[in-house]
Amino acid sequence: MSAPVRRISARTGLDETSADGTFKRTDAAWRSTISREPGSTFPPEKDRYHLYVAHACPWAHRTLMARALKGLEDVISITVVMPIWQRTTPDNPNDEHTGWMFADHSSSGNNVVTNSAGLGGPFPSSYPSNEADPIFNARSVRNIYQKVGDKDGKYSVPILFDKKLQTIVSNESSEIIQMLNSQFDEYASCSEVDLEPEDLKEAMESVDSWIYPSLNNGVYRCGFATTQEAYDTAIDELTAAFDRAEDILSSQRYIAGDRFTLSDIRLFVTLLRFDEVYVVYFKTNTRSVANSPVLLNYCRDIYQMPGVAETVDMHQIKEHYFCSHPDLNKFSIIPRGPDFERMLQAPHNRGSFEVKRRRISQAAVSDEEKHSLKSDESVVSTL
């Protein structure tokens, strides 16, 4: 009897479910830091760093938003990968890995027309915003990792790449957005924007501690659960976190206080995809943003900030989710509604929190002035 053929499969999100049916996300492996400190291996420089991103991916979307809000478009270049996962080594029948691919606009290019199971579509073979890899001319994101010696990791985006040293700096989105916020001010066109102000750091850490596990990752814990018990635990936590965000945002403009921060980016990228994808695909239908006036207005407020709408491509978001996992959606049928991005273009009233805050501040100053006048009067009366 011949030995069984070992089928190679680099890891994807679908491979991160434990024996009890719980989705457990693998930690990012590349965690270096861009720093202005003397002797830093990765100092901030213009045109040195490159971001590999996907419009579909909420983790990558974080970096696109931070880059836009800080005005780093002319400082850090980007390449947007194709939305639908494909076989990364289609000529090797023993390697079943599927993942992010780069666009191939050549006439002979093997562009995306179906899902990795050969079903669904036909989908557009290319998009104007999706490009070939400008550094290695790689066909897949997997190839980028392999170029720097990562042969068996999880080949994810975003990737912050150092073109000078030809290596990956980081693939941890939460740390990349901190670097974009703090380390490139001398080059940023919006250097006055601080997305992690010192006086809000404690509040940010507090909200981030439940936004990530229960919402950002919570939707995946619901969608990739393989037992009812695992799903029930995840959906209970997600529902509670959704309500918690709604409660906080009913009394203040932003999730960590009176200013927009990185925590709002973290929350927004999940809420943006919630009704269009997660409610249906990941079975998070206990709540919806459209049915929450508070969260819908909050999303409108952020979407309408200069530069944010340009980071959103709902078409690619939906194509990725509904067409990249044949185990979840074999025929890659894409639901038509609910046109959430159109909802975000309507006016919002979140600015009323600023008016209220100014009135409270003015009232406080007025009270102090009254107290000061009374003190002066008492001094005069004693002379």
What are these regions (language model features)?
Residues M1-L383:
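C-terminal alpha-helical interaction module
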